[in-house]
A protein has these predicted regions:
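Cysteine-centered motifs
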Residues: 3-5, 20
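Bacterial N-terminal signal peptides that target proteins for export
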Residues: 10-29
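Bacterial N-terminal signal peptides
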Residues: 26-38
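Glycan-processing catalytic domains of CAZymes
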Residues: 42-361, 367-396
Length: 398
């Protein structure tokens, strides 16, 4: 919903997320801005902030560390002390309404929780259920939980998290926000992450936010979930960055990482992984206008020098490229069009793509101190394993 201060300013009230989205479109707000504005209150998530969250934060004493790292969302309890601490640190909370969707769903407890905490400015969204597709909780039971939350008077949106992007055809349009988690490192190809974000986006209404949940843990700590898998490890800094930009390339409107506890609170800690994640989140914050940019269709043509490696393990293009339009730029990214290209593989590639129009000047590569090699129509560049390049702003056409 629109946050209270904006709703009062406009003299508007909305009880449905879709109504909020339609209103926001009329006002010229992006889906990401709506996700920020409509969920946690103006103070907690101002319009400019792109949603970046993290799971399993433990006590509220850790929230300052999390806020300092650039996160503005966490999962946590619907408890006054925790919500107050989150608000003080400028963080929104994805919280359970007191009972998860399923056979044991406690509607009375949910109504009481919503009545007590829904208006708290730090309450970002009500977490209906985690991975109903994996746990075989039917879409009908999830819908029932969503309806109970809404009938209880919730103004904050509902959320659910899927395990498989293909299941979004059944679950993707139940909650106000659809999330999907894929943790492929190292037992699946990294391309599996990108593939399932894409499936979720395609099966979910275009005006419904999709949030990607990214692996930031070592499966060694959860080896019982992957019996027989060997050589488990956490993601590298390059894999973390590639998955983060893959989420943007495949249409996600926000990102979460799993989890703070795995890196910082358990007996075996991962300080290098935490530092790598902080660098990625800092980069997202510096490039917020890119992450909030509009995806634009273009008559794309591309080519791989080595045809034998042009497909990744998901049988999609090894390098995923999209055209983005930044409407409201900043000092780093002026308004204009940019091409984001993400190598989803552990292999190097020489990759060529045709520009949307014949360029009348050089094509800068964002924050790399160089210009792309181009003849005005095509760009050719070298991609290291899991590399990310951003080209733009694209010069005007001739």
């Amino acid at each position: 919903m629109l946050c209270g201060c904006l709703a009062r300013r406009l003299g508007l009230e909305s009880r449905a997320m879709n109504g909020c989205l339609r209103l926001g479109q009329a006002l010229g707000l992006s889906a990401v801005a709506l996700l920020a504005l409509g969920s946690a209150g103006c103070r907690v998530l101002p319009e400019a902030d792109y949603p970046v969250g993290i799971y399993s934060v433990g006590s509220e004493t850790n929230l300052a560390d999390i806020a300092d790292a650039g996160f503005n969302l966490v999962t946590g309890p619907a408890r006054r002390g925790f919500l107050d601490a989150a608000e003080a640190n400028g963080i929104g909370v994805l919280a359970s309404p007191g009972s998860h969707a399923g056979e044991g769903f406690d509607a009375a407890k949910v109504r009481a929780t919503v009545a007590t905490h829904d208006r708290h400015p730090a309450l970002w969204s009500w977490y209906l259920i985690d991975e109903p597709d994996m746990h075989r909780v039917s879409p009908e039971l999830v819908t029932e939980a969503h309806q109970v939350v809404k009938r209880a008077g919730a103004r904050k949106p509902t959320s659910l998290v899927l395990f498989r992007g293909d299941e979004a055809q059944w679950y993707g349009n139940i909650a106000d926000i659809t999330m999907v988690d894929r943790y492929p490192v190292p037992w699946l190809p990294l391309a599996n992450f990108s593939q399932h974000i894409h499936k979720t986006r395609l099966a979910t209404d275009a005006n419904r936010p999709v949030v990607a949940v990214i692996q930031s843990f070592d499966w060694t700590a959860h080896q019982g979930v992957l019996p027989g898998e060997e050589n488990l490890r956490p993601p590298t800094k390059h894999e973390l960055r590639s998955m983060t930009y893959s989420a943007l390339a495949r249409g996600a409107n926000g990102i979460f990482y799993y989890s703070y506890a795995d890196m910082r609170l358990k007996e075996r800690k991962y300080p290098e992984l935490w530092e790598a994640l902080k660098r990625v989140v800092k980069e997202v914050r510096q490039r917020e206008v890119l992450f909030a940019a509009e995806h634009v269709w273009w008559p794309k043509a591309h080519h791989f020098e080595n045809q034998d490696t042009r497909f990744n393990a998901a049988l999609e293009a090894s390098v995923q490229s999209v055209l983005l339009r930044v409407k409201r730029g900043d000092g780093l990214l002026p308004p204009g069009h940019y091409i984001l290209a993400v190598n989803t593989t552990p292999l190097p590639h020489t990759y060529r793509f045709r520009l949307p129009w014949r360029a009348g000047g050089q094509v800068p590569v964002l924050e790399e101190g160089r210009h792309a090699t181009t003849d005005g129509s095509w760009v050719v560049d070298r991609f290291d394993p899991f590399a990310v390049h951003v080209y733009g702003p694209l010069p005007a056409g001739k």
